[in-house]
Amino acid sequence: SSKPFISVNCDQVFEWDTTSLQKKMKDNPKSSYITVYPHTDTQRHSFAHTKDNTDKVWMCTEKTTAGHPTNNATTGFYHFHNGKVFNESVNKLLSKPPEFGEYYVAAVYNELINDGHDVRIDKIHTKTFWPVGTQHDWQHFTHRHYRR
């Protein structure tokens, strides 16, 4: 299908109003979006590097790279503007050896970018997103969330 779609990892909790992001998707139907939040932990995140402090992505990496620091850590919420284009990009990615020994969803955006597609970030607030993929993350979330 050439319809847009969203893929969300299962190891995080989101509590944010998506109205702004939905408007961006509607206003820019040929753009794909990746949500990010400010974090620098290279052991837990992929990163979206943007051009000149804009929302336009020029590269996604599993680690921050020398000479290209960023704190745009991906959240695991991935929007693709076109399912057919997504499939083509995934097939290109899978035809290459995996970076760091495994494939990452964020790397699909590099294939989109290489083929001239528009990829943008949408920043979310740290108080509306909690990673829960490790025991430490889960304990942090439950301690903060259930003490409200």
Provide a role label for each language-model segment:
Residues 19-20, 132-134:
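Short secondary-structure transition/capping segments
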